[in-house]
Swiss-Prot record:
The keyword Nucleotide-binding applies. InterPro entries: DUF520, UPF0234-like_C, UPF0234_N, YajQ-like_sf. It holds the Pfam family DUF520. GO terms for cellular component: cytosol. It comes from Haemophilus ducreyi (strain 35000HP / ATCC 700724). Belongs to the YajQ family. The keyword Repeat does not apply. Keywords: Nucleotide-binding. CDD domains: YajQ_like (cd11740). This is Nucleotide-binding protein HD_0358. One of its GO terms (molecular function) is nucleotide binding. It comes from the Bacteria.
Amino acid sequence: MPSFDIVSEITLHEVRNAVENANRVLTTRYDFRGVEAIIELNEKNESIKLTTESEFQLEQLIEMLISACVKRGIEHSSLDIPTDAEHHGKLYSKEIKLKQGIETEIAKKITKLIKDAKIKVQTQIQGDQVRVTGKSRDDLQATIQLIKTAELGQPFQFNNFRD
């Protein structure tokens, strides 16, 4: 029976490149001259920490990072950006988490979405991915289109397609 997996993965190498590009832009920006501003990637925690002297500059750093990520093929929705900034002394900071894998709650939403569409496929939640199995390729392709058009707050990739 044909099957495929729905996953949500970010290549950390591309994230590292995006952070380096954002840092390069940061050094050339006139409004950040003489300002303590840092964009750093923590690969162990899968997070990006932004630090600067004011909240406005922090928002500018976020825009630079998002722009660099989009240029590297990383979708904006794969970044979990907190709404409020932490304030330590004269510095403001935000820690942006990278969304890796599909959480159980979102996997259940995907399963419910597919069942509500009445496509003749079966879904299985397997850790941080969802396996979809069906009798025909057309049903699987209809499922892929359904997931691509759904707004679930996270980008998805489809891999391990078997016939």
